[in-house]
């Protein structure tokens, strides 16, 4: 485990999809001081990007009060979307540079509300590159998919 500053929440999030669209899952690993919490869930029909957004939303929603948070994701869509593209999309009336509607707008709006509660630093790591906490978040996301598939098989 990497050295972590005290009184900062470290949030590692990941989304996964089997088929795109298809059954998907999200996973979150939270660390605060000596405490650790794992969250996951799944959806029967979704996309990988929707699950990436949902992971960040659910992780931030789980924090009971405003915090300093370091969010680590392997999704450039999530990191660049929240740090670079969101203000531009809003200025353009939720349109991309091609004048098309922004995909997943309701999720982006929900994420923005959650982000406003906290002081956040966003980090990107390459997926499946051996980053221990990101691998745990990935395992949790896949557990979310497995649970959806198990429910569907009943």
Swiss-Prot record:
Compartments (UniProt record): Cytoplasm
Protein's GO biological process: DNA replication, removal of RNA primer
Protein name: Ribonuclease H
Pfam families xref list: RNase_H
GO molecular function: magnesium ion binding; nucleic acid binding; RNA-DNA hybrid ribonuclease activity
Residues bound to Mg(2+) 2: 14, 138
Bound cofactor: record note: Binds 1 Mg(2+) ion per subunit. May bind a second metal ion at a regulatory site, or after substrate binding.
Chief place where the protein resides: cytoplasm
UniProt-listed InterPro entries: RNase_H, RNaseH-like_sf, RNaseH_domain, RNaseH_sf, RNaseHI
Quaternary structure annotation from Swiss-Prot or TrEMBL: Monomer.
Gene3D superfamilies per record: Ribonuclease H-like superfamily/Ribonuclease H (3.30.420.10)
Known role: Endonuclease that specifically degrades the RNA of RNA-DNA hybrids.
Top-level taxon: Bacteria
Stretches assigned to the RNase H type-1 domain: 5-146
Enzyme Commission number(s): 3.1.26.4
Family note: Belongs to the RNase H family.
Cofactor(s) the protein needs: Mg(2+)
UniProt keyword annotation of Cell inner membrane present: no
Reactions catalysed: Endonucleolytic cleavage to 5'-phosphomonoester
One GO CC annotation: cytoplasm
CDD domains from the UniProt entry: RNase_HI_prokaryote_like
Positions with a binding annotation for Mg(2+) 1: 14, 52, 74
